[in-house]
Amino acid sequence: MAELEIIDGIISDRESPTLEFKNCRGKLSKDFWPTYSAFANTFGGIIYLGVEDGTQKAIGVDDPEKIVKEVWDLLNDRKKVSANILSPEDISIIEVDGVPLVRVHVPRAERSRRPVYINGSMDDGSYKRNGEGDYHCSQADIAAMLRDASEDAQDSVGVDGMMIEDLDRQTVESFRRRMASMRPHHPWASKDDGEFLRLVGAATGNESDGYTPTLAGLLMFGMDCSIMQHLPNYHLDYLEYMGSGGGWTRRITTGEGEFPGNIYSFLMEVAPRISAANDNPKEIDGMFRVDDTQMMKCQRELLVNALVHADYRGHGGVRAEWHRGWFSVRNPGGLRIPLEMMMGGGFSDPRNPHIAVMLSLIGLVERTGSGVCFVADECRRRGIGLPEYTETADPRTVTVRLETPPAASSDASPIKAMMAEDGSVTIDDISNATGMGRSKVMRIVTRMKESGEIERIGGTRGRWVVRRR
């Protein structure tokens, strides 16, 4: 966060989900600790001590060193807080408008340490941040944090009262055919259904005692009515908003009996729509195409990523929306690793690793932690905005939004990006870098010149100038 802006002794910044002011002039106030818990359990934030309530006037603290010592003493008292997540650099004494304030940066706690609670009570001392306030966590909030804190895979538990015969056989057969076509010599291909499902993480047990579906197996291969008996909030939804009105023009949703409603069948239903909405009528084979475009791969990656990372006990379900110009996917559950680490690639922490394994066996999850990085790299190559991630606290969800420019605009974007970076770039350079034919590049460049998006200065030995529009 930038330094505070002071106007006539008043701090112009307002309290927010990640910013809080406390009076604390003479001593550390009791309401410091609910905010500490709330920031740690939500998105993190900064607390300034020495700011008058209501007026936001910087009044300072009388003895900042004493306040800092008290904070550290109580942070290391397990009767007061369940965990100290601060480093020495997180607490500092600063001067604002001539008076001393104490600045406390509270990072978001790692998932293994949440919930962070106070006064020795997880039930009564766990808080979350919502808007400008600190609120008690509900039992559902606490349960969700405890699920995330566990090192056990959320989708590995066996589903009581079910047998693998309760799974949708057609879905299992379709999955096995697809895997066999992609991995014809895989050693699991010859196994019977029970042992095959155990090996891929969809079942637990053995041949003599029988096999029980895991949660991953139920989600991948079960009927949606059976899934909802164990996960009442389960719902997968895909909507297109391609008309001139405000409502959706096409919808694929679970729970209506038109297809089995499990994750695998949902992906097989949605894939042709993603292709059609990309105005790409070539042959479709489930989620795969002969000429799968990079933008289609990005959209598929974001959808698969949401399905793998969803907290299916949370609220809201997985929802994909396609509007003119953008595509978004929302899943229940917060981020389990920092966004910066996720965008950098190379590390993944899925809630449902067994679902990830099954999708990797049919080519939908390729490399650990590389999917989001691939999408970001493709956006940079096209010269469009990076995927935007939004996380909400109540309900806890993650939404990612991706720009989807029309095909002509999409082809123009990498050309403009290259010209903006190097005005001396040639048509042949662009053709080689983008994979587009020289004649196609020429047509797009001519159109952009006519529309005023680019300009050529200096003839054949000149340079390109991109006009920001």
Task: Please annotate each region the language model reported.
Residues 459-469:
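Short, cationic-aromatic polyanion-contact patches
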Residues 408-425, 432-434:
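Short amphipathic alpha-helical interface segments
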Residues 301:
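Active-site alpha-helix of zinc metalloproteases
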Residues 447-450, 466:
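Short, charged alpha-helical interaction segments and adjacent helix-coil junctions
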Residues 456:
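Short beta-strand "wing" residues that participate in macromolecule-binding interfaces
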Residues 1-294, 304-405, 426-429, 435-443, ...:
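Conserved N-terminal catalytic/coupling substructures associated with nucleotide/phosphate chemistry
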Residues 298:
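Conserved N-box helix within the HATPase_c
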